[in-house]
Amino acid sequence: MLSHPMKLLFFVFALSALLAAATPVVEVRDYQQFSRVSLINFISFNKARGGDLCANGKKTMCCGELKTFDKNILGLLDGLLTTVVGLAGEILKPTGLVGLECVPITLLGNGGLSDVCKANGVCCKDLTLRAAINVGCVPINIL
């Protein structure tokens, strides 16, 4: 008959073997491919439940350029402000980045977001000037 310490040792080894056999082993060789699949699954889940990749009323956009909001950008947008009513308060107190040459990302396509957007994937406020300039953008990882 086994002594108490031997029983405990046997129990620990048996439990370790059981847990090791029950734990799935996942080997990821291509991390970028894994992250793309994870992002696509996340987006698909959000779309299926009626959500969006971007929260708080922001829109998923693909922008050709991202700029920090400074006086040069304000000068560029100054002419546009006269034609857009109600945006002056938002422009004078900006948060985030300004996205230039932006288009909304609505379809994933066969290859995922990286095929749809080869530039900068961002979440922008639902505030667009002249359909290509977005205010209050935050970069997202599209790979």
Curated annotation (Swiss-Prot):
Pfam families documented for this protein: Hydrophobin (PF01185)
SMART domains: HYDRO (SM00075)
GO cellular component: extracellular region; fungal-type cell wall
Compartment list: Secreted; Secreted, Cell wall
Superkingdom of the organism of origin: Eukaryota
Alphabetized GO MF terms: structural constituent of cell wall
Keywords for the protein's UniProt record, in alphabetical order: Cell wall, Disulfide bond, Secreted, Signal
Entry-linked InterPro entries: Hydrophobin
Cystine crosslinks: C54-C123, C62-C117, C63-C102, C124-C137
Major location category of this protein: secreted
Signal peptide: 1-22
Quaternary structure and partners: Self-assembles to form functional amyloid fibrils called rodlets. Self-assembly into fibrillar rodlets occurs spontaneously at hydrophobic:hydrophilic interfaces and the rodlets further associate laterally to form amphipathic monolayers.
Family: Belongs to the fungal hydrophobin family.
Function in brief: Aerial growth, conidiation, and dispersal of filamentous fungi in the environment rely upon a capability of their secreting small amphipathic proteins called hydrophobins (HPBs) with low sequence identity. Class I can self-assemble into an outermost layer of rodlet bundles on aerial cell surfaces, conferring cellular hydrophobicity that supports fungal growth, development and dispersal; whereas Class II form highly ordered films at water-air interfaces through intermolecular interactions but contribute nothing to the rodlet structure.
Entry protein name: Class I hydrophobin 20
Organism expressing this protein natively: Pleurotus ostreatus (strain PC15) (Oyster mushroom)
Gene: Hydph20
